[in-house]
Swiss-Prot record:
GO molecular function term, any single one: unfolded protein binding
Organism for this UniProt entry: Shouchella clausii (strain KSM-K16)
SS bond partners: 237-239, 270-273
Name by which UniProt lists this protein: 33 kDa chaperonin
Keyword field contains Chaperone: yes
Amino acid sequence: MKDYVVKATAYDGEVRAIALRATEMVKEACKRQGTWPTASAALGRTMMGGALMASMLKGKDKLTVRIQGNGPIGEIIVDAHASGATRGTVTNPHVSPELNSKGKLDVARVVGTEGTLSVVKDLGMKEPFTGSVPIVSGEIGDDFTYYFANSEQTPSSVGVGVLVNPDESVLAAGGFVIQLLPGAKEATITEIEKRIGETPPISKLVEQGKTPEEIINGLLGEENVKFLETKPVFFECSCSKERIGNAIISLGTKEIEAMITEDGGAETVCHFCNESYSFTEAELKALLEEAESKR
C-alpha cells in the first residue's frame, strides 16, 4: 500500500480531519539515519506531524519542525513541503532505553520532557511564520496537539505512531489530526472526544491495513465525513552537489583555501540522507574564485 495523506471535513464543516499512512516514508528516513527502534519512533512521529501540518500548505510552501528536548536523542529536525516531500534527522540515532511502564518504546525518555517544539513556515512572503511552544510530554503527538492549540489557536487532537519490527525496521507508521473549526458545537466536541478515546493506536490501525479514509471514518463516523483531497507523502531530500557547493562558498575564502592547501579536496555528508559529496582540488579552486568574486 502506498503512502498518502487524505483531507476531509466533518459535521457540516465544524471539523477538519487529516490522516496519513507513512510507513515507507518513515522506513526510508530511518534506514538513512541508521536509527535504533526508539529513535525511529521519535523521528517517525515528528516526520508525520510535519507532513500532516504541511498538507495544509499550498503550492511551494514548506515548513521546518524542530524538537529540542533534554533527552539523549538531542535535536529532531524535519523539513516538510506542501508537495508531500518530507525529510528528517536526529542528533543521536543510537538511543535505546528500556521499554516504558506500558511495555512500549519510551519516546518521552529519549526526547525529554523539557524543551521546545518550534515550527517555521516559509509561505513565500518576506518573513517566515514562526511559532514555538514548550514540550508538554515528549511523546510528540501531545506536543503537536499543544502547538496547534497555543501557537495557532486551533483546538486539535494529534495522533502519530510507529511500530518497529524485531529486526528494527519500520513495520507501520501513520497519523491523524482532528481540528475543531470556529462554531463547533459542544455536542460535536463530546462525540469526537468519545470516539477518539475508543480508537486503537494509530500504528495498529495502519498495521491492520486500514486506509487513511477508514481511519478518519472510524474517528468521526462515516456518515459525518466529506473527503476533499488525497496526495502522496514521501521521503525526499533536497540536497545536491550544487547546494553543497554553495554552502562551501558561504564559508568564505579562508576556509576554502585551507581545504585546498591542507586537504587537497573536501568531502561532506548530508545530515538528512547521508549522501556523500566529494570535491576535488580543481572544483574547490572554482568555488574559491566564485567566493572571491562575491567579496
